[in-house]
Amino acid sequence: MAEEKSSGCSPESCSSCAHAGSCSSAKKDLKAPANPYSQVKKVIGVVSGKGGVGKSMVTASLARMMVQQGYSVGILDADITGPSIPKMYGVHGSAVGSEAGMFPCVAKDGTKIMSVNLLLEHESDPVIWRGPVIAGVVTQFWTDVMWGDLDFLFVDMPPGTGDVPLTVFQSLPVDGVVIVTSPQDLVQMIVEKAYNMAKKMNIPVLGLVENYSYLECPDCGKKISVFGESHIDEIAEKLGVEVLGKMPIDPKLAEIVEQEKFYEADNQYLKNRSEERRVGKECRSRW
């Protein structure tokens, strides 16, 4: 039975309400309007049930794959307290704006990026905000940023099922989510949490991506399961979703990230990786 809404409940407070998925107020359309200078065709959330699975890496990999195939792409970095997307692309400095809104920063490959790190005086300054404030900033990245014409906007979300994922699902017109995981013992329970949240919010799950799936020996080519054997296929079958890819641990990719040159990743990593191409193909084929 649905939870009764608390006294003083209103649609505006849903982003931080424990009963947002079940009360009558939550069923209203709370979608925030996009900036008038934004024409975004598809919004894809990249989520995970827990941290440490390389979600930002998968987000950037999906974005690079789309750019490589000629699409216009943006990344909304919704991981407010742990942003990493700008640094991966070598994007520094401050975002600028006008009366019409904020301009996203543009990486060397044309990827448009907005992140809280682009608004801080110093990149190393911590963001010590409570949940509702963080959720409000994420919404503003949609309403106040002039994204322009985009084929895909990828939303890199913080791990878990808290305020930010709830805000994104309620406030942005999310067309689908990709769930990122890794081969560990508790993976099934964690994946199911993310999956169940998306389903409760009526967001389509495009599929699962397993990161850190294996390490390929540079001498013999043998695939080594560093973090244990993969269970992603069984989990996907149980949930009735696709396995979009199994991404390996690749020292070359780590080096690109360290050099802040992810805009070159198509030449050094993605170009010959059929797994990542398959992920991109799946995202396109759903529409």
Regions found by a protein language model. Give the residues of each.
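Residue-level signature of catalytic and energy-coupling elements of molecular machines
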Residues: V40, G51, D77, I85, ...
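Phosphate-binding/switch loop-helix module in NTP-utilizing enzymes
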Residues: L120-V168
